[in-house]
């Protein structure tokens, strides 16, 4: 009990400290001072009167949403004496593996720099700045020669690192478990089984109305949808983040989705947010970074060739180029197992006082990175709002998909959860695929690392991301990956090679997400 109270007071202190540096804090302060002029504020009951004023004027709700938003990304409380690196990742071998992986990425980036004889960063000449500013809204028409640039890494390279991950303190001895024999992921992490997942995703139950399911026997779909829209409008009118998060677990109506996601992520486009975005844009105009070419190359290789997303090419460049300059992203490294890469001012290699984070946001884009942004372009058409939503989605969720950690939503746990679900509930299929050299994870990894973006039809992907936001968890990605294998099990049992298995699972664009999840979670015999 005492420990819980101490944890709570520590969390409160840290959130208060974080909010003190925010724009909301100064707005609340200004409102409090302004309220002193009001006749209903009495000196003898000053504290209570100001609280009441905040409640009536809606500022209390804004403060609640800000606190709720901080709690959503806040790491679990650790021992007060624990060093800061424990907050990033408690397991030493995971931290070491992440550190080694980062060195490989940086080496790859630096060797590209040397091979192509180009600097990591340079100031653009005035003429080039003007040219970029003029074509800012039509960068997709640009055709720079990117043939010499290559992605720093692709998901399959990252998978090999995860496959070789081992806990040096863990000795299985002779009693090898079923999972250790069959799975590619060989680290002992606790993952949920289906009964625990049912409990976690209870709102996805067969007898609960869902958007994304057309054949409910209990209630006619249009009746449920009309009622769900009405409740959604009420949630938006209340401007309550927690209520919006609970509501969206049953899916979001298309017309309300953009506002609901913004409410859950606590994004409200203030003039200062637009100004901040414009400052980032100015940084892009003034300086050319090597990662800009990696971003161009990635968009050209992925989104530009996608039937759904090619129309958003200009938006993707704008958002990702600004993202690479955004130093506010660095704050998420406090609870991310990764650390931002460093570079040194020319001629000062190794001198820490001349070290700078590169790129400025600390995130080196990899092959497929632009697909985290692409689906959001369907919801937000104003660049600064689109940018804010993506940045918040990244620091809450997406960073976990390309860093090595023991977090339940981290990619290692998702891979292990996927393999465990298949091995436990579809053992014949799993064993068959393993025997023919088609380990299921080799096929599903690319889906999970991209959060299924670029694989599902957009309406289905947005329904899936509704649930990621609703449950504040990425575990549903592993469940869906297992559900896809279960759905195609009959065909997969007939294949005799990895290529044939990949062909069976090549096109997911016709799949309906919610029926697959429901059947796998609630109709599987456990």
Curated annotation (Swiss-Prot):
Sorted keywords for this record are: GTPase activation
Which molecular function term from Gene Ontology is one that the record holds? GTPase activator activity
Q: Where would I find the Rab-GAP TBC domain in this sequence?
A: 251-472
Note the Pfam families from the entry.
RabGAP-TBC
Q: Does the keyword Iron-sulfur apply?
A: no
**Carries keyword Ion transport?**
no
InterPro entries in the record:
Rab-GAP-TBC_dom, Rab-GAP_TBC_sf, TBC1D19
Looking up SMART domains in the UniProt record yields:
TBC (SM00164)
Role this protein plays:
May act as a GTPase-activating protein for Rab family protein(s).
Name listed for the protein in its UniProt record: TBC1 domain family member 19
> What organism does this protein naturally occur in?
Homo sapiens (Human)
Q: Which classification does the entry list for the species? A: Eukaryota, Metazoa, Chordata, Craniata, Vertebrata
